[in-house]
């Protein structure tokens, strides 16, 4: 896939300074440069019209300007990255069907092809207002893990539901495997959600008016707010699970080790 086949799109990297599990993780050193700089540089490779770092803290602003990034300062009271994204879209006056990609600031090795496939998926589905990514689950253990978010889709590859629960359910198969180990059956349609989001600017403009849904509150999954409102979410399929991001200091050490082996 080449960038010539892509529609125009913008990338915003929400970069919150405070993190409950790993404070200041975006400024942590990874192979001689901050985690955030890795993310910014991979975003540049995607061929977007613009790449913007959105932050609420002057230390991140200073660091980002230092490595040549475009920065927009945002409020510090946002509940999530989508709210920060919506503020940037309004400030930049992006409107209508303009496509905006949310690339998380703690994903230094996100494959660029996932950005491309999700942008193309949204562009091709004119009824969808946002898109995301999923890949196949093959391990039974992952299927039953509540930290692995699952998604089921309709025949147009639009999301029907996201859940921490195992779905869809193999009524007969799981009854015969009480240990919940091993591999899922070949062809079993279990999909793991990957947290990359692509929006039309028109959806971001009305995001603040969308109330939190009961489903979102129970599952702790922000994307359920959109499904609850009847918003169509297109799901692009990835060939495999990308390298894990930086959620904890242990994650960072793993990436440092992999980088030292040149295995990323």
From Swiss-Prot:
It catalyses: 3-deoxy-alpha-D-manno-oct-2-ulosonate + CTP = CMP-3-deoxy-beta-D-manno-octulosonate + diphosphate. GO terms for biological process: CMP-keto-3-deoxy-D-manno-octulosonic acid biosynthetic process; lipopolysaccharide biosynthetic process. Its main location: cytoplasm. CDD domains: CMP-KDO-Synthetase (cd02517). It is found in: Cytoplasm. Its EC number is 2.7.7.38. One of its GO terms (molecular function) is 3-deoxy-manno-octulosonate cytidylyltransferase activity. It comes from the Bacteria. Pathway: Nucleotide-sugar biosynthesis; CMP-3-deoxy-D-manno-octulosonate biosynthesis; CMP-3-deoxy-D-manno-octulosonate from 3-deoxy-D-manno-octulosonate and CTP: step 1/1; Bacterial outer membrane biogenesis; lipopolysaccharide biosynthesis. Keywords: Cytoplasm, Lipopolysaccharide biosynthesis, Nucleotidyltransferase, Transferase. InterPro entries: Cytidylyl_trans, KdsB, Nucleotide-diphossugar_trans. GO terms for cellular component: cytosol. Pfam families: CTP_transf_3. Belongs to the KdsB family. Activates KDO (a required 8-carbon sugar) for incorporation into bacterial lipopolysaccharide in Gram-negative bacteria. This is 3-deoxy-manno-octulosonate cytidylyltransferase. The gene is kdsB.
